[in-house]
Amino acid sequence: MSTPENPSVSFFSLFRRGQLYAKTWPLEKRLAPVFVDNRVIRITRYAIRFMPPIAVFTLCWQIALGGQLGPAVATALFALSLPMQGLWWLGKRSVTPLPPTILNWFYEVRGKLQEAGQALAPVEGKPDYQALADTLKRAFKQLDKTFLDDL
């Protein structure tokens, strides 16, 4: 993600944007070869579900076996930070402007939605990945799967 992001986004709002982006992005198998987002969202959801219990287990296990408190806490904090890293990455991704090749495809999908009679809000500024996620989610609901053939 070497493209400039929206500078007005605060650190903590990236986590909320990451959650919204993960809920919005369509987890379709045909998008997986092109976008890494499918894998990151699945891994982040897995980490949100399983890392807190793993952190508690490793902390209790190391303390119960007479281990030192410092490494036990460090291991638990690392396990707890993994879901946050995923949400942060997704938040950064959601505000990243689309590269030119994906931008052209974004406008093609929007055009197909408008041809199908769907009312779309006008795009404000340069579209980002959140706008792409919203458009793709709507396209998967309203259009047939052939709109992905030119991807």
Curated annotation (Swiss-Prot):
Any one Gene Ontology cellular component term annotated for this protein: plasma membrane
Pfam families membership: DUF412
Transmembrane parts of this sequence: 46-65, 69-91
UniProt KW keywords: Cell inner membrane, Cell membrane, Membrane, Transmembrane, Transmembrane helix
InterPro entries to which the protein is assigned, alphabetical: UPF0208 (IPR007334)
Record's keyword annotation contains Membrane: yes
Parts forming coiled coils: none
NCBIfam families listed in its UniProt record: PRK01816.1 (NF002493)
Name used for this protein in its record: UPF0208 membrane protein Ent638_2839
Organism of provenance: Enterobacter sp. (strain 638)
